[in-house]
Curated annotation (Swiss-Prot):
Homodimer; disulfide-linked. Interacts with the serine proteases, HTRA1 and HTRA3: the interaction with either inhibits TGFB1-mediated signaling and the HTRA protease activity is required for this inhibition. May interact with THSD4; this interaction may lead to sequestration by FBN1 microfibril assembly and attenuation of TGFB signaling. Interacts with CD109, DPT and ASPN. Interacts with EFEMP2. Interacts with TSKU; the interaction contributes to regulation of the hair cycle. Interacts with TGFBR3. GO terms for molecular function: cytokine activity; growth factor activity; type I transforming growth factor beta receptor binding; type II transforming growth factor beta receptor binding; type III transforming growth factor beta receptor binding. GO terms for cellular component: blood microparticle; cell surface; cytoplasm; extracellular space; nucleus. This is Transforming growth factor beta-1 proprotein.
């Protein structure tokens, strides 16, 4: 036997004994993953989440607990948080790895439509079958200084009761009173209000790059060739002038707005620096009596588990983690057996076998205080929704 074979012999003896003791069975389901105590796994996961949240917010330590004002959240901040939470709830998780720019938390900003009583609407050539929503681009640029920082932009409208089904179309304000078609939506009859959302990320990026002082959208009824009536039947919150007092204030707050998610400028400066991606549970493989790799529920209470009072909303969330066996086949007659043996020799704490890891993750919107100022941000990849063997 050559010298290299003698050096590998001690590594192969345990596997040979296993094959001799179990004749007639393939070497399937073998794993070098370590058995981890469940409570230890949960504690490690909680500590990883603690570091992940601070890292995504670019904080070296939690803000002072005494800085949190003991008062209810302002209505505008709460409305912004609820809009962000509802949007996340309506989206499916992205299983692909996030780009480097998506690692850090996104600052969420709400830019309200200019009230329809403003004189700037007089400059727009109107149609009786449409509603018009104008925005000051100066407010957009204040929220997002550079177009490249914008991650997503949505136009959100609160649709009130609708008696009959209607097909509507959204247009972008173009040059010389012309309008460019963007998308359409078929609205079903409903007795309850409903938020409508349109992805306008590309349009807002254009406005940030070379837009005018005022830009906007038009919502119109779909005009089919065989229909004589193209009246817009949809009642959108913010376009009725019959309300007074506090009701008018609430009505105005829920008028159409742009929901912007962008990387803050100070965080963007770190995007080009080299860093090692943080990943939860990469140092551990799990095995249990479960039949398959699966999602295990883990609820994080910010006060109880992390000792934090500075995150105002939510009070906690289901972070979850992945757990379960990942069977694989490793036989002695494969050309990779020596490579795997050497890998284990040089990486005794690692596993050459596939392990149960997150596949689909979802973001987490939060409201937290910086001094006495509340902020709404979205933390990417915080909730495990599905797992895979990798």
């Amino acid at each position: 036997m050559p010298p290299s074979g003698l050096r590998l012999l001690p590594l192969l003896l345990p596997l040979l004994r296993l094959l001799v003791l179990t004749p007639g069975r393939p070497a399937a389901g073998l794993s070098t993953c370590k058995t981890i105590d469940m409570e230890l796994v949960k504690r490690k996961r909680i500590e990883a989440i603690r570091g992940q949240i601070l890292s995504k917010l670019r904080l070296s330590s939690p803000p002072s607990q005494g800085e949190v004002p003991p008062v209810p959240l302002p209505e505008a901040v709460l409305a912004l948080y609820n809009s962000t939470r509802d949007r996340v709830a309506g989206e499916s998780a992205e299983p692909e790895p996030e780009p480097e720019a998506d690692y850090y938390a996104k600052e969420v900003t709400r830019v309200l439509m200019v009230e329809n009583t403003n004189k700037i609407y007089e400059k727009v050539k109107k149609s009786p079958h449409s509603i018009y929503m104008l925005f000051n681009t100066s407010e957009l640029r204040e929220a997002v200084p550079e177009p490249v920082l914008l991650s997503r932009a949505e136009l959100r409208l609160l649709r009130l009761k609708l008696k009959a089904e209607q097909h509507v179309e959204l247009y972008q304000k173009y040059s010389n009173d012309s309008w460019r078609y963007l998308s359409n939506r078929l609205l079903a009859p409903s007795d309850t209000p409903e938020w409508l959302s349109f992805d306008v990320t590309g349009v807002v990026r254009q406005w940030l790059s070379h837009g005018g002082e005022v830009e906007g959208f038009r919502l119109s009824a779909h005009c089919s060739c065989d229909s004589k009536d193209n009246t817009l039947q949809v009642d959108i919150n913010g376009f009725s002038s019959s309300r007074r007092g506090d009701l008018a204030t609430i009505h105005g707050m829920n008028r159409p707005f742009l929901l912007l998610m962008a990387t803050p400028l100070e965080r963007a400066q770190h995007l080009h620096s080299s860093r090692q991606r943080r990943a939860l549970d990469t140092n551990y493989c799990f095995s249990s009596t479960e039949k398959n790799c699966c999602v295990r529920q883990l609820y994080i209470d910010f006060r109880k588990d992390l000792g934090w009072k500075w995150i105002h909303e939510p009070k906690g969330y289901h972070a979850n983690f992945c757990l379960g066996p990942c069977p694989y086949i490793w036989s002695l007659d494969t050309q990779y057996s020596k490579v795997l043996a050497l890998y284990n020799q040089h990486n005794p704490g690692a596993s050459a076998a596939p392990c149960c890891v997150p596949q689909a993750l979802e973001p987490l919107p939060i409201v937290y205080y910086v001094g006495r100022k509340p902020k709404v941000e979205q933390l990417s990849n915080m909730i495990v929704r599905s797992c895979k063997c990798s």
